[in-house]
A protein has these predicted regions:
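Membrane-embedded beta-barrel scaffold of Gram-negative outer-membrane proteins
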Residues: 1-13, 139, 145-151, 173-239, ...
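Transmembrane beta-strands of outer-membrane beta-barrel pores
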Residues: 2-5, 59-63, 108-114, 150-156, ...
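Face-selective signature of the C-terminal outer-membrane beta-barrel domain
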Residues: 1-8, 22-123, 139, 196-199, ...
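Gram-negative outer-membrane beta-barrel transporters
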Residues: 98, 102, 201-203, 227-315, ...
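C-terminal beta-signal and adjacent terminal beta-strands/loops
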Residues: 307-312, 332-392
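Transmembrane beta-strands of outer-membrane beta-barrel proteins
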Residues: 51-55, 102-106, 132, 146, ...
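Short loop/turn motifs that connect adjacent beta-strands in outer-membrane beta-barrel proteins
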Residues: 43-52, 99, 141-143, 188-192, ...
Length: 392
């Protein structure tokens, strides 16, 4: 895979103080994986035929080579990043009574990693990771079930392969979290109304965060570097609701709402800013979804409205998005062999930012003297299209 970009973002001659820089990456990746699963049947259940079981093993080998061609490097940068993973997992689902079920599971993983590059940097860490889950499910009645669970999850550590990043920022550590969840699921009104609700709390440790830093070179030009690092601790609290209702064979209605409070308990970012107590990046306070689907014979019409609260773009600065709503619709005509659809996304042509950058000490516009300013990447504008599908 090869990709690159124009680092100066401008065309030649735009300003007397402009600079020209190209950054190109050539990556080669080889991946091999194997997973085997063994499941119980009626004759192999455990504990007096009350417990189903699952056992599995998983292996993964990944080898990634990088060649970076960059204007400000005296020679091309090379790196090789390899990791081997071997894991085993086991799960038991036990019927403690007609209404009560206990689910337990565990996964243990061994990960061996090597990294070396053309600047003579090399790392070879190994780590043993584990995660698991314990859940209790209680059947309230024939249509409703409540559950409670506690789980431990993890993300393996890794490396930032950018050749110009400081050596002490190349490696990042494992993240793990403990999650507590309570929930209920119900099927009502002759199984035409499906309801879900959940409440969760996450304690995150050594949280992996996407950071960025910028540098001014000797000639006055700038360099921007994205990398992954570790925050100390974070806490996530949230509530989720979902309702799906089919009042008739032709009409379907869906509504969902998620509320989230995700903050850093303690975190000093790459610019030595204390973000303790601040919201984590890309963690909107609410997300909502409304949808309708109506069918009459071969015709169908569907519409949806999605809403998202404001959020921070990064853990390296304080630039935020604005709240926004997106309206989508589709009208279709279908036969057994073909279908024709007229559809539109973002029908109100809402301007909304999905990513934001702010480099603090400088900007990247020579016409403004490289004054610091935010740069925003917007989502797609109003798009209207026609889709024709046929089965041969």
């Amino acid at each position: 895979m090869e990709y690159g970009y124009d680092e100066d973002w401008t065309f030649a001659g735009i300003h007397p103080d402009s600079y020209m820089s190209q950054d190109n990456y050539i990556r080669n990746r080889k991946t091999q994986s194997l997973e085997l699963r063994f499941l119980s049947n009626e004759s192999s259940r455990l504990f007096s035929n009350s417990t189903d079981w699952l056992f599995g093993v998983y292996t993964l080998n990944n080898d990634e080579g990088l060649r970076r061609e960059y204007t400000y490097l005296t020679s091309d940068f090379y790196s090789d990043y390899t990791f081997d993973t071997a894991a085993a997992f086991f799960q038991l689902d036990s019927m403690l009574s007609e209404k009560l079920t206990l689910e337990t599971g565990i996964r243990v993983e061994r990960r061996d990693t090597t990294y070396q590059d053309s600047e003579m940097l090399s790392f070879s860490p190994s780590e043993t990771l584990w995660g698991g889950r314990v859940a209790i499910k209680y059947l309230l009645n024939s249509n409703s079930m409540a559950y409670a669970s506690i789980a431990r999850g993890y993300k393996a550590g890794g490396f930032n392969t950018d050749g110009t990043l400081d050596a002490d920022l190349r490696e990042f550590d494992e993240e793990f979290l403990i999650e507590y969840e309570l929930g209920v699921k119900s099927n009502l009104l002759d199984n035409t109304l499906h309801l879900k609700a959940a409440l969760f709390h996450d304690d995150r440790n050594e949280q992996q965060v996407k950071s960025s830093t910028g540098r001014i070179r000797a000639n006055g030009s700038t360099e921007f570097i994205d990398f992954i690092g570790n925050a100390a601790e974070g806490t996530n609290n949230g509530v989720e609701f979902e309702a799906v209702w089919y009042p008739s064979e032709r009409l379907g209605l869906t509504a969902s709402l998620g509320l989230l409070d995700a903050t850093f308990d303690s975190f000093l970012n790459s610019k030595n800013q204390d973000l303790s107590g601040r919201d984590q990046a890309h963690a909107p306070g609410y997300m909502a979804h409304l949808a309708v689907d109506y069918n009459v014979g071969a015709w169908s019409i569907a519409g949806s409205l999605d809403a998202k609260d404001d959020f921070y773009f990064s853990d390296s600065h304080h630039v935020q998005s604005d709240p926004y709503e997106l309206l989508n619709m589709r009208v279709s005509y279908s036969t057994e062999r073909w279908s024709l659809s007229l559809w539109g996304r973002n029908l109100t042509d809402q301007d909304y930012a999905v990513r934001g950058f702010f480099f603090g000490e400088f900007g990247n516009d020579p016409r403004k003297g490289y004054a610091p300013e935010p740069y925003l990447q917007f989502g797609e504008p109003r798009i209207i299209g026609v889709t024709y599908e046929v089965q041969l």
